[in-house]
Amino acid sequence: MTWIDQAINGLKRTDIEMIAYLPDTTISPLVEAAKDDDAFETVLVTREEAAVGVLSGAWLGGKRGALLCQSSGLANTFNALSSLSMPARLPFLGIVTRRGDLGEFNLAQVTSGYNMPELLDDVNVRNHSVHDEDNVEERVRMAATTAFSTETPYVLLMETTVTGYKEESK
């Protein structure tokens, strides 16, 4: 079973109903799988911090939601997480493809991507890096359980050892 199939299963098993996303090459197969599955309502957002608002509204309306994006985009959410989600106890799950580390060719991805776990720690958003494709479903379920039981955001960073990496065009 691929990491994508496992992630979809983990989302379903934890009653995630809404997916907010920004397209990216690496996360696109997961986004497409969610869009093709009737279990999810998908919402394309123009900026990642808008997803925090969409998912906060979903929670207030009785739905659980998840954000799918890449790590450089996740950095755009920090103000919304710090000023809305954290103080108002509005949970969501982030499934984020990690850029800026192993296999990275784009220097612009390194600044926030390489340091993303520490940056999330600095804004008090719990996070976990997933390095092994074999346990994606379990990690998604565990992260969602933590996020929704504690009413706080939780981010899973999907490492390139799971997702593969984006190769430089020549």
What does each model-identified segment do?
Residues M1-K170:
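Thiamine diphosphate
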